[in-house]
From Swiss-Prot:
It comes from Pisum sativum (Garden pea). Keywords: 4Fe-4S, Chloroplast, DNA-binding, Heme, Iron, Iron-sulfur, Metal-binding, Oxidoreductase, Plastid, Thioether bond, Transcription, Transcription regulation, Transit peptide. This is Sulfite reductase [ferredoxin], chloroplastic. Coiled coil: none annotated. It comes from the Eukaryota. InterPro entries: NiRdtase/SiRdtase_haem-b_fer (IPR005117), Nit/Sulf_reduc_fer-like_dom_sf (IPR036136), NO2/SO3_Rdtase_4Fe4S_dom (IPR006067), NO2/SO3_Rdtase_4Fe4S_prot (IPR045169), NO2/SO3_Rdtase_4Fe4S_sf (IPR045854), NO2/SO3_Rdtase_FeS/sirohaem_BS (IPR006066), SiR_ferredoxin-dep (IPR011787). Phosphorylated; this phosphorylation reduces DNA-binding. The keyword Acetylation does not apply. Pfam families: NIR_SIR, NIR_SIR_ferr. Siroheme binds at residue 545. The gene is SIR.
Amino acid sequence: MTTSFAAAALRDPKLQIPNYHGLRSSSAASSLSRNALSVPSSTRSSSLIRAVSTPAKSETATEKKRSKVEIFKEQSNFIRYPLNEDMLTDAPNLSEAATQLIKFHGSYQQYNRDERGSRTYSFMIRTKNPCGKVSNQLYLTMDDLADQFGIGTLRLTTRQTFQLHGVVKKDLKTVMGSIIRNMGSSLGACGDLNRNVLAPAAPIVSKDYLFAQETSENIAALLTPQSGFYYDVWVDGERFMSAEPPEVIQARNDNSHGTNFTDSPEPIYGTQFLPRKFKIAVTVPTDNSVDILTNDIGVVVVTGDGGEPQGFNLYVGGGMGRTHRMETTFPRLAEPLGYVPKEDILYAVKAIVVTQRENGRRDDRRYSRMKYLIDSWGIDKFRNVVEEYYGKKFEPFRSLPEWEFKSYLGWHQQGDGGLFCGLHVDNGRIAGKMKTALREVIEKYHLNVRLTPNQNLILTDIRAAWKRPITTILSQAGLLLPRYVDPLNITAMACPAFPLCPLAITEAERGIPSILKRIRDMFEKVGLKYNESVVVRITGCPNGCARPYMAELGLVGDGPNSYQIWLGGSSNQTSIARSFMDKVKPQDLEKVLEPLFYHWKQKRQSKESFGDFTVRLGFEKLKEFIEKWEGPAVPPTRHNLKLFTDKDTYEAMDGLAKLQNKNAHQLAMEVVRNYIASNLNGKGE
């Protein structure tokens, strides 16, 4: 589609681009040629090619029931109308249809749920940053936009992106345009299409890591919408797209096996896009920083002799979202699909996406994720259908070593003479002194940034001579080396929840600091050491954005001021937790958790994690511990650290601590740690 036509479509919302049905099962689409734009098979690995064709669709099938969102998509002129009209009005909010469509552009309409009375609307903008890469220019732009148009903070997400909260409707076009013009994008960060593609954020210069990151960027490019709606709405049709690798263009255009809508501005998505959100992660063996098994597609680099990438293992069918008290909805781990040579990865991913596009449910969005399709069909049938779109049989899944959670916090060698520094950001919220210090360092040393799937941030390409001054600046703002951060905090995550998320039913980000402090107090009470930890994740609703169902201890919003407790995930995020107890009030957490921590301390096997312990003993036994709990049998030895020698100092510290939801001892220890870190001036790690 030409830029002039796109601009005309924006000026005249009634001007229609020819309509292409989003499903091949529709009779109108059945006559389209399936072999246009085909690519000679010689450009790909020729092993195991077989003659295949897309399964025939019934011409007489009655039209299936569709959800309201499917109707909005069909009538939207490729995600333009009525959003383009709504953006021209003075109303502070969007219509129902436009509220759904703006998600495809990377934004959600929200309102402050702490306020009573009339709603104060604003918008959250989420960027799209494959493998978490953020240029120096884009970071500084986002920092500016947060102050000028947001709430003064940046939020790092569990999918390696930024969230900018509090943008009012009249400023949306300015903010979106600024992001686009400064090497950023929010296209496809939300909505029924492929979301941000994850990959290990660490800038390690090795063949496998570099190949994983390149692959994530290529998959993201392959599945980026092509019809121009994003640029039409926000920058009047002007395109700001970087040149794509030829293999991406070739894979997108290939229609050898009936994957594409010919002559459509959206060759992969059509008018209907996907039934629901779609998530992909790429990684290397052992590195599970991306929670690989929680994605619709998990892609794992397989290397040969000398570390040279040879191909990929593929997992399919992961997903977190569920609905309380509906057993037909559930979190699910991805399972092995097969292996593909490296030159075929884009074709294999496209075949999986098209299988979901054609067969995922569009009548009830609670069951529209690909995990439900695979659960219904079984992996063998799913594999067979994907192979028909792929044009080959998948090779056997290659063996892999054990997965590990890797945070990449602290100082590390990149492998090219430079250093990178991983910084822990509690709940991904960059604010206050931390925000100021990060800007100072990133701007002064012209650093690029990587965002991690654990809501943290990595500064990259640092010269050795800069390590000491950078450490000093960061530590003075509370950005500490990992040994000064409570181990509970390092692996903990929470979604934003209240006050802005419309789906939240209880606190998450605002509640987790006090909950982690209480868990630390419980650890001390039952005799667990400071360096011991459990993976804690909290969400304000059952959608599971912070992936609580993979945690050793997951707290999931279960009504106002209450949580559903999930137990049994593993510390390396390879097993799924199970629902343990419903409707637990925050004030009752000690009654439930303290006996569990005590018996873990007393009855665990050598190096047994809390999650593994809860699985081994079983929920019946754990509930028995809770019912019979009367406190620790023997009070543990406590360190008697007398930090305060006079009452005035204590009262002053206590007053400051209460402002930060801490006690005097906790704040004093934090001050001491900051002082020590500051005076180390970057010595050691």
